[in-house]
């Protein structure tokens, strides 16, 4: 099971304050050092703890199978692309599997992944992805989130806007019966988006993986079987 953390829960690590380190950065470092999923990701060879969120989503909904075409939006540092590559048994020589990953930040190569280093919101990016797909996608997935500022309402709206744009893109490239996965932050303004998604997909679920931090308002929108 992805949430088996036996052996990864270490003693609490304290972080000393420093004149060169802000309070927020000290808190982030303390959280990272004491997060068992961070340690597990390091041991399992994943680039981020977010990999376990996608693994849990797959365990719940059984989305990934071999011979799929997948788009990973906001892919850096590549944890979700790594998981997708493993689940569909992708390789650089298997043309039946295709993962197109996009981010403005560079990521190291992942087997079976074609990386597009572009800002998703630039005018020509969608066309580049569509050309790289050479067909329609089975899954569009997005773990994109805006840089949080600690104001929950603002963080909620900003990440919701990213999800909306990912959804509009998914409608253009998904094949019938394709799936859409995206992060949102709960906050009340998501209802209109959920209404739109439910019109386009047969089944729409909310899911909060156990690997998602308990204090976080993030949940994942899992939209199954595009109409």
Curated annotation (Swiss-Prot):
GO terms for molecular function: rRNA (uridine-2'-O-)-methyltransferase activity. It is an enzyme of class 2 (transferase). Its main location: cytoplasm. It catalyses: uridine(2552) in 23S rRNA + S-adenosyl-L-methionine = 2'-O-methyluridine(2552) in 23S rRNA + S-adenosyl-L-homocysteine + H(+). Its EC number is 2.1.1.166. InterPro entries: RNA_methyltr_RlmE, RNA_MeTrfase_FtsJ_dom, rRNA-MeTfrase_E, SAM-dependent_MTases_sf. Specifically methylates the uridine in position 2552 of 23S rRNA at the 2'-O position of the ribose in the fully assembled 50S ribosomal subunit. This is Ribosomal RNA large subunit methyltransferase E.
